[in-house]
Structures are given as structure tokens and as C-alpha cells.
């Protein structure tokens, strides 16, 4: 009897995830804690280790497929472990019981109405729903009981489009799900015919998560963006002075830690920027902590690791942590815990050569600070035209919560601190 390894409960409220990559194949020998696969959810890519030592017999869930907690992913020849259970198996047993009940109900429905589609019989208040956490939240926000919605995604998964169709009084046809199951996951080959050849490929789990988060934020929060710039002559000199000292400590000192400190000070001065809105209860959540998300551009997509308690850390410590999290983001090693709990976010388009832009709020946060490149520009100082390094700043905010004048005052506060690093350190 083979040992069945099921998708474990990895915490963070995650009930399912996409199998991004398998690191083993049938016939491979694995040891305990060897990485079996990578699973992508709404928050991060998580490595799933083997709980036992044994030989891989069969991979049951291929790459690109969404699996639920408790679903068997792989079978192993691991003598002595055949009857061992792990966290998440209870969900699988419940799933089997529900499946039996569903079959029984379908038989009764068929006896009354043999021509009724089976897909319609599956939707109901007692069925088990497969849906990403973001879709479940979207359903709650729209006042929809997701158990009543017929899913058209792979394995009957409920998509955001299914919620919209339900609200519109209809549902997507069930055959679409069957077609998706039968369709190959590989990209369609390019056609050499015609003037405009095209290819198609499946969206990655991270790209889908980013797309859903961006659409949800723009649809939920009325965005307003203020654009300004700060004279960072003194800041450039300050960084230059301490850059070598930081290097001696093995730290790469950038301008980002200074921006983090300035933003934290602004959040303290204007606490409305450090809030969120509970759309279900219509309550304002005032956050009494300062966790700053740092948007990181990676080959897999945009990830946002979080600097916890940024108000308690000096510049060098912030620089070190930012560098470490950025490296983990690029290597795909971030854990869900390192990407949760942000109260406000910074995004940097300056590293790509950009200046002003309209950053999208990382909902449910209510503000996001965008920083652009530092460019030499002519300015008037003490009645004379001089060249000065100017830092482009873009502050997007949720107008439901923050008034324009308040946002501009907060941006002015940030500008003042970045223009005077000594004052910034006094504030910090």
C-alpha cells in the first residue's frame, strides 16, 4: 500500500494553490524534508517538503493545476508510513463524504428530472466550494453566497467572472469547465499563416494573482494621485558619506531606507494614511503599527515583501532587511508571512528609469508612495538658478478615506524630510 501525500495546510488562510513546479519524478528516491514541489497561492510561492523517506511512485497533480488542501498530490513507496495522517487529511475525508452525498443527491434529482444538467445539481448550500481566497472575499463583498454559484474553472473552481454572472442573473455554461479540463495546458503553437502570427500561453499563478489584486483595488478604491518632487541635494551627500561605512558592514545603502523612514514619519503625523476600510462592516481600521511593504520587480512578477515595525529600525538595519527581502523575492524564496501585514507600501519606478506614475494601491491599504528616478534639474535657490538632484514622488490614495489636502500635507512632510536628512534622523 502506497503512502499518499496530500497538500498540507500551509496556514495564512490558504485553502488551495497551483502546482508551479515538480522537483521529483516517478522512480526518484527522496529523503525526509526534500522539496517535492512549489505551490503558488494568492500570497507567495511555497516549497512543499516530503514528510517521509521513500520512492516516488506517481505524481497525481500535474504542473499548472490547482489543488485543494487535503488533495493527494503524489504517492510514495514508504514502508511503515502507509497509514500515517497529516494536517489537511481531515479535509480530504470530508471531501469524500460530501462527494458521496452529492452522488446520492444527483441520483435523486435524476429520478425526478433525468434531463436536468448535472452541473446544476452540484450548486447548492451544502456543496464544497473550490475558490481562491480573493474570489471568496469578492463574493462576500458583493453579498453573494458562493456555495450557490456554479464554478466554470478547472475542477469546478469558482472564478470572479462566475460571481459577476451570478449577479447578472445568469451563469456561465458548465461545458466550459469540461472543455478547460480536456484542453492541454501547453501553449498553442505559433501559426505561420497570415500577416499577424500569434501565440497563446497560460497565465502563471503569480500573474493571475497580480491581475486580480489590481482589478479589485481599482474597482473598490477611488484612486487619486498627487505628483511632486523633492530637492535631495543633502540626502545625496549624506548617502555618499555613509555608503562606504555601510559597505564595510556588508550593507548596500540605497535611498530606499531613507524613504521608508520619511513615510513612517508621515504615517505618524497623518494617521489616516495608516488605516484601512472593512468593506463588510463599514468600519475604519486604525493601525497602530508601521509595517512598510516594498514592491519588488522579479522575473515571476511583482511581489511585495514587508518590513515589519519599520519605525523601530535604524537606517542600516532597514537597508540590510530590504536587500535580504529583495534577494529572496528574486529567488522565489519569500514565505507568506514575509508578504503579509503591510500598513502602507512603497513602489520604486526610478530603478527602471521612470519618474512620475500612478501607482495602484495595495488594497486594503489606503495609500501607496511611488518614487521615481533622481534627475539633475535647474531650480531657483536663494534667487539663483542652480542644478539640483530632484526626486520624483507620486502618492496615490483612497479618496473614500483620505482628503486631497491631507494627502498633499503628508507628501509635503515627506518632501521636507527627504530634503533634510538630519531632520529625518531626528524625526526617526
Curated annotation (Swiss-Prot):
Q: Which residues form a coiled coil?
A: none
Q: What is this protein called?
A: Dihydrolipoyllysine-residue acetyltransferase component of pyruvate dehydrogenase complex
Q: Which InterPro entries match?
A: 2-oxoA_DH_lipoyl-BS, 2-oxoacid_DH_actylTfrase, 2-oxoacid_DH_E2_comp, Biotin_lipoyl, CAT-like_dom_sf, E3-bd_dom_sf, PSBD, Single_hybrid_motif
* Reaction catalysed by this enzyme: N(6)-[(R)-dihydrolipoyl]-L-lysyl-[protein] + acetyl-CoA = N(6)-[(R)-S(8)-acetyldihydrolipoyl]-L-lysyl-[protein] + CoA
PROSITE patterns attached to this UniProt entry: BIOTINYL_LIPOYL, LIPOYL, PSBD
Q: Which organism is it from?
A: Geobacillus stearothermophilus (Bacillus stearothermophilus)
Modification N6-lipoyllysine occurs at: 43
Molecular function terms, GO-annotated: dihydrolipoyllysine-residue acetyltransferase activity; lipoic acid binding
